[in-house]
């Protein structure tokens, strides 16, 4: 990987910084989340939200979406050039929920985007604070990952719905920068590339002319991002082939789908960050916590600490289970939608169940839902232990495959085996090893066949007590090796529709 020497930690990507030492990183990440908190407090003042209403996760999401929309340059420009009926390109808004006479009411608010931008900049020392915006995008993306299934999107691009564990970050907007690229799964990158290649096949001019040159640069950049996520030489070599193709077409699509399948066992490195709703940072700032001075990290104990001391509420529909709603938000907060349920349950200290068993729908409430019957309850976002977030796929050692699983992309750096049904995965690799990538394909299949489900990943890594902030005493959990835990089994979640 060419950028080896300039590898930045994800906190640096998150804050757009050059290389910094640990203290500087903690300070700049602290500045970023502190800015989000200050913005949130100001918005609550503007909207005259009570303390309880300000802690409502649905209100937090509306406020976050407003600021993201206010800074969405490309869409703003598009809206101004293509005026559509009933949409004011200069305004943004959404539903705000208020408590009136013992009932929840929905109020639709509208604000000038200019005004929202002013409040955001003011909260961020006059800067645009793009890092904070990206942070909010990643929180929304993590929430989508935990809430919706992407079966339809997978099938549309010719991939297998069982590859859902590779789809982290699939709803992130294009403008989410380096921090966004770091959290995208293998499947997400493959899907973006396939969509691009398909456009090129259907539209003769896609790769031509001035625009085509820009398209080509974007294509190669995406290929390089994907290449950087693979950890074996053969997978990377195949990515070079895809990137260098003169005229990307069906052969490249085949190669990409092959690579995506291979990532079920030879997992890629995908970053995980605990991005919390804006109201959580707001609560901390309001209570006098100075994020910049104290420093903050998205991958250590800090988010766990913050959630231990925050009370957040959620609207609950009549037949939803509040404990299940809490699990959904907990998973989103820790970017754990693709983590092994055995690991998540151990860290959380309560059983985390597969999505098919959850009696809850998404967090956001549609405008046509009846507010009369809405109730609210406290989200239980606390944990029993904390663990370091990982950006590796948990392969037992870099060049050799370790057992993957049809649906796990580890979030926490905690020792476990990664059980998987090799037969199921290998069945997808019938025959086709001819063509220009044949030797690489053969090599990849060989590595996958030598993977053993009983291999231990993250050897010796454990969880920590919440009092152990320096991570001195790892507690290595022992898991039932046979029982494998994917969140997506027996899945009946709704599809993500933009």
Curated annotation (Swiss-Prot):
Pfam families: Flu_NP (PF00506). It is found in: Virion; Host nucleus. Its main location: virion. GO terms for biological process: symbiont entry into host cell; viral penetration into host nucleus. The keyword Cell membrane does not apply. Keywords: Capsid protein, Helical capsid protein, Host nucleus, Host-virus interaction, Ribonucleoprotein, RNA-binding, Viral nucleoprotein, Viral penetration into host nucleus, Virion, Virus entry into host cell. A motif (Unconventional nuclear localization signal) lies at residues 1-18. A motif (Bipartite nuclear localization signal) lies at residues 198-216. GO terms for molecular function: RNA binding; structural molecule activity. Late in virus-infected cells, may be cleaved from a 56-kDa protein to a 53-kDa protein by a cellular caspase. This cleavage might be a marker for the onset of apoptosis in infected cells or have a specific function in virus host interaction. Residues 1-21 are annotated as: Disordered. GO terms for cellular component: helical viral capsid; host cell; host cell nucleus; ribonucleoprotein complex; viral nucleocapsid. Encapsidates the negative strand viral RNA, protecting it from nucleases. The encapsidated genomic RNA is termed the ribonucleoprotein (RNP) and serves as template for transcription and replication. The RNP needs to be localized in the host nucleus to start an infectious cycle, but is too large to diffuse through the nuclear pore complex. NP comprises at least 2 nuclear localization signals that are responsible for the active RNP import into the nucleus through cellular importin alpha/beta pathway. Belongs to the influenza viruses nucleoprotein family. Homomultimerizes to form the nucleocapsid. May bind host exportin-1/XPO1. Binds to viral genomic RNA. Protein-RNA contacts are mediated by a combination of electrostatic interactions between positively charged residues and the phosphate backbone and planar interactions between aromatic side chains and bases. This is Nucleoprotein. The lineage of its organism: Viruses, Riboviria, Orthornavirae, Negarnaviricota, Polyploviricotina. The gene is NP.
């Amino acid at each position: 990987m060419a950028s080896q020497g300039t590898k930045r930690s994800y906190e640096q990507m998150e804050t757009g910084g050059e290389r910094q030492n640990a203290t500087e990183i903690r300070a700049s990440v602290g500045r970023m989340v502190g800015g989000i908190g200050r913005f949130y407090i100001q918005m609550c003042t503007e909207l005259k939200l009570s303390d309880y209403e300000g802690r409502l996760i649905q209100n937090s999401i509306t406020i976050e979406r407003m600021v993201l929309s206010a800074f969405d340059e490309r869409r703003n420009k598009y809206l101004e050039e293509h005026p559509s009926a009933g949409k004011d390109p200069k305004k943004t808004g959404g539903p705000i929920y208020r408590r009136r006479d013992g009932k929840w009411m929905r109020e639709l608010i509208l604000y000038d985007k200019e005004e929202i931008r002013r409040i955001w900049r003011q909260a961020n020392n006059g800067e645009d604070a793009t890092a904070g915006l990206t942070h909010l995008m990643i929180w929304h993306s993590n929430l989508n990952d935990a809430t919706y299934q992407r079966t339809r999107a997978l099938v549309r691009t010719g991939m297998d719905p069982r590859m859902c564990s590779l789809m982290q970050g699939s709803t992130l907007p294009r403008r989410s920068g380096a921090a966004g690229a770091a959290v995208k799964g293998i499947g997400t990158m493959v899907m973006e590339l396939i969509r691009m290649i398909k456009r090129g096949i259907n539209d003769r001019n896609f790769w031509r002319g001035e625009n085509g040159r820009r398209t080509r640069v974007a294509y190669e950049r995406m290929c390089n991002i994907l290449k950087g996520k693979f950890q074996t030489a053969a997978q990377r070599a195949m990515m070079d082939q895809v990137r260098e193709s003169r005229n990307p077409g069906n052969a490249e699509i085949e190669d990409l789908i092959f690579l995506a399948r291979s990532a079920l066992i030879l997992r890629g490195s995908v970053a995980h960050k605990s991005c919390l709703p804006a109201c959580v940072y707001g609560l901390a700032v309001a209570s006098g916590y100075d994020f910049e001075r104290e420093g903050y990290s998205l991958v250590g104990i800090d988010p766990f600490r913050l959630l231990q001391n925050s009370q957040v509420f959620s609207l609950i529909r009549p037949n939803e289970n509040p404990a299940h709603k809490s699990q959904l938000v907990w998973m989103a907060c820790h970017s754990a939608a693709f983590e092994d349920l055995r690991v998540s349950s151990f860290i959380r200290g309560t059983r985390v169940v597969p999505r098919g068993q959850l009696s809850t729908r998404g967090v956001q409430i549609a405008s046509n839902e009846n507010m009369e019957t809405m109730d609210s309850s406290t989200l239980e976002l606390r944990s029993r232990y904390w663990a370091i977030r990982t950006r590796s796929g948990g392969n037992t050692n870099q060049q050799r495959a370790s057992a993957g699983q049809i649906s796990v992309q580890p979030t926490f750096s905690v020792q476990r085996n990664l059980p998987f049904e090799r037969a199921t995965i290998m069945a997808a690799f019938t025959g086709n090893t001819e063509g220009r990538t044949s030797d690489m394909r053969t090599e990849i299949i060989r590595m996958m066949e030598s993977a053993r489900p009983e291999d231990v990943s993250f050897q010796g890594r454990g969880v920590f007590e919440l009092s152990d902030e320096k991570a001195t005493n790892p507690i290595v959990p022992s898991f039932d090796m046979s029982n494998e835990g994917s969140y997506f089994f027996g899945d009946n979640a709704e599809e993500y529709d933009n």
